[in-house]
Amino acid sequence: MGQELKEKAPPNHIGTIIFQAEEQIENTPIVELGKAFTLRFDDLNADEAYYYYTIQHANADWTASELFKSEYINGFDEVRIRNMSNSSATLQSYTHYALNIPNRDTEIISSGNYVLSVFDDKQELVFTKRFVVYEQQANVQVGVFRLRDLEGIDSKQRIEIGVQTAKINTRQPDQEISVWALQNYRWSSARKIPKYDYVMNQSLRFEYDNNLIFEGGNEYLFFDTKDIRSAGGNVAYIRRENLYQSILYPNYVRNGTVYTYAPDINGNFVIQTTEGFNPNTDADYTEVTFRLRSSETNYDFYVTGLFNQHLPQPVHKLEYDSANNLHQLTIRLKQGVYNYKYIAIDSAGQLFENGVGGSYWETENEYLALVYMRKFGDRYDRLIGVGTVSYTHLTLPTNREV
């Protein structure tokens, strides 16, 4: 088995990586074959450096596929990102880069999993991002429900997946079809659903496997820095030094408390500014200070969200302030609305995803099902269908196809 192609976090001078498909708000490209998507990022060195990109095809399990580049790209990659512009009237200078695909050099021609890598002019890897390209072949339905078992009934959610096979010519679906599911577009939550449970009306039904059960988690916390000069949502106060500083209200450990509904964007972020017309180059950066009220010192606490690819990185570790009985961290983020959460890691390196926020069956989450096909003799996994479902305890589960 090959090595999994994981996402690599960028260095500190690279900020605000946005990776979106056309007409999607999710900051994770789920792209229909032939449609467009865009990568954006800022270089806070602001020196108009040259960056280059490559694209690698992967199997359903994110190991490198056997395809030659000419089999999944029309044209070529290893091309410089030419679209760049400098920030305008901001305290923090930066160069903004944008890569649109397809472009005159690169067109994706095969479905499946992909990893886009960005390199500097010394050919050193800067960061990587995953994306998927699908063919609209299989109709995929996803439902989400409260767990039936008493163990976990208050903290977990269960999904069910149906894959219509009428339009996909398969005689051995147990060998040719593979299904993966993930929560809130987080690749770290992805798991394979080993086998369908039964067939009904030409639909493969996945309903009983334990990999269909997810911790509900809790609603993400949020803050709003659209107006850099005044305190927005969950910002306690603003002060000005070299940059504006946004000091957030202290958060508390929610694990063990009663669930409270609060609308969120499932860990995402949206760049916005009240000053300027183009947030890509007019939005400024602010020093955001996170504060977690806790006397716990047996765990390391990290702040995560899509803004740092949900990865607990050393630069996002909170430091304990014994005088004020809280853990805090200051990082530089572009103006906008952000979701975030705290995670805990013990001295043995074990990660507790919901140790701070708790886990509740009522939590609103979005689930994504990816359906792959590899027929006998094929050399790669085609992504033939995608389905999503959003769940909130205030409404019935709703299905939508991508």
Please describe what each predicted stretch is.
Residues 392-398:
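Conserved small/polar residues in nucleotide/adenosyl-binding loops
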Residues 15-57, 153-163, 278-289:
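Contiguous beta-strand segments within globular domains
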Residues 73-97, 187-194, 287-335, 347-374:
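Aromatic-rich carbohydrate-binding modules that target alpha-glucans
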Residues 250-297:
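Basic K/R-rich, polyanion-interacting modules in nucleoproteins and related proteins
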Residues 89-101, 200-219, 323-328:
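Aromatic sugar-binding surface patches on proteins
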Residues 5, 133-156, 361-384:
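Low-complexity, Pro/Ser/Thr- and charge-rich linker/hinge segments at domain boundaries
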Residues 1-32, 135-150, 264-276:
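Short, compositionally biased P/S/T/A/G/V-rich stretches that sit at domain boundaries
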Residues 120-126, 229-232, 346-355:
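Short acidic/polar inter-strand loop motif in beta-rich domains
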